[in-house]
């Protein structure tokens, strides 16, 4: 086919310069966000085809895998308990929870967790249900402490020790930290790790880290957070992420 014939064939398709620029990259880059429903031009074994960004995302996910995926987030209100039930063993191996500025409505109490094996219909709250150990360092010389299931309440697993809210800045700081729960879909002793920062009732800066297991071989498919007395004060956010398994 001669050059003239090629040009004539191209002209007969009604292709515009703008469309050609989009194909060859000559158009200027912008900040238009990609969204569901958008199309992507691909070369399918020599044939130009349009596919959707959803199809592209699925394909890339099968090649890349891993990483964190947002599941849900709760802006804390004045409630007694907060539950997360977005566990999905077909997608995630483990889970990460982040706590931002979480405070109790009562001075000198801590945050705890309880597990569920029935999707959140009930939570494990019998004495002896949890084994745990945690250590914390506080502002001041040689102020290090530990707590474990031999000298504490075992109807829950602690995330923090006592948080101060009586005066500023304690009430403004709250608890900031993370919780990891590992492979809860397995019928094993499901456990995890916690760490975070808060101010105690005396206003001392405190860093606490620890670990726990549910003292029974069973899966976990929901988590409940609560306070050792009273409930949550309004404010702050708890967010759940899944660690993608493929």
Q: Positions of the model-derived regions?
A:
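Surface-exposed molecular-recognition determinants
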Residues: 19, 24-28, 37-39, 43-246
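Parallel beta-helix/beta-solenoid repeats that form elongated, surface-exposed shafts/blades used
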Residues: 30-32
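Short, intrinsically disordered N-terminal pre-domain segments
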Residues: 1-14, 244-246
């Amino acid at each position: 086919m001669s050059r003239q014939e090629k040009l004539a064939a191209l002209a007969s398709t009604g292709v515009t310069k703008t469309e050609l620029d989009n194909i060859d990259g000559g158009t200027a880059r912008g900040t238009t966000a990609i969204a569901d429903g958008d199309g992507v031009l691909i070369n399918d074994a020599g044939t130009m085809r349009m596919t959707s960004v959803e199809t592209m995302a699925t394909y890339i996910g099968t090649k890349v895998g891993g990483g964190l995926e947002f599941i849900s987030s709760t802006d804390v209100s004045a409630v007694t308990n907060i539950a997360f039930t977005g566990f999905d063993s077909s997608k995630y191996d483990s889970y990460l929870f982040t706590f931002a500025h979480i405070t109790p409505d009562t001075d000198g109490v801590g945050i705890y967790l309880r597990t569920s094996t029935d999707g959140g219909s009930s939570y494990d709250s019998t004495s002896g249900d949890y084994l745990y150990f945690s250590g914390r360092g506080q502002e001041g010389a040689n102020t290090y402490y530990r707590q474990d299931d031999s000298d504490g309440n075992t109807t829950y697993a602690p995330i923090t020790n006592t948080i101060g809210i009586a005066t500023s800045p304690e009430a403004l700081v709250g608890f900031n930290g993370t919780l990891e729960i590992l492979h809860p879909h397995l019928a094993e002793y499901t456990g995890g790790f916690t760490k975070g920062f808060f101010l105690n009732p005396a206003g001392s800066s405190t860093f606490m880290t620890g670990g726990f297991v549910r003292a029974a071989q069973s899966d976990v498919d929901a988590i409940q957070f609560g306070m050792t007395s009273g409930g949550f004060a309004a404010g702050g956010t708890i967010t759940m992420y899944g660690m993608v398994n493929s």
